[in-house]
Amino acid sequence: MITARFYQKPSNGSIHMTLKGHAKAAPYGEDLICASATMLAYTVAQAVQFMYENGKLKKKPKISLREGDATIVATPNEDDYAEALHTFWVAQCGIHVLAHNYPQNVKLEHLTV
């Protein structure tokens, strides 16, 4: 089961995405559900990296992409917060579709921090 979490920390203005686990819908390397979730994480990571390179983040983002474990944390500048939030929101929409269509493989947790 892949567990996805998206949340914001108002105390420091950071936006978070984590993916943990495996879909286990097919053998390693053939699992399209896992590949879909992974692609969403890589897309957010790249978008956040571009934002950093363009001076839109307060500090370097935390990007950790490992097998079965992805963490992405961005702390955007105040003027760029909406752009960053939209980036994470689009990925959350994708994970929502996966969780809706494959509830036995993907779980989306809504957190309030």
Model-based region annotation:
Residues 1-32, 42, 46-113:
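N-terminal intrinsically disordered, cationic/polar leader segments
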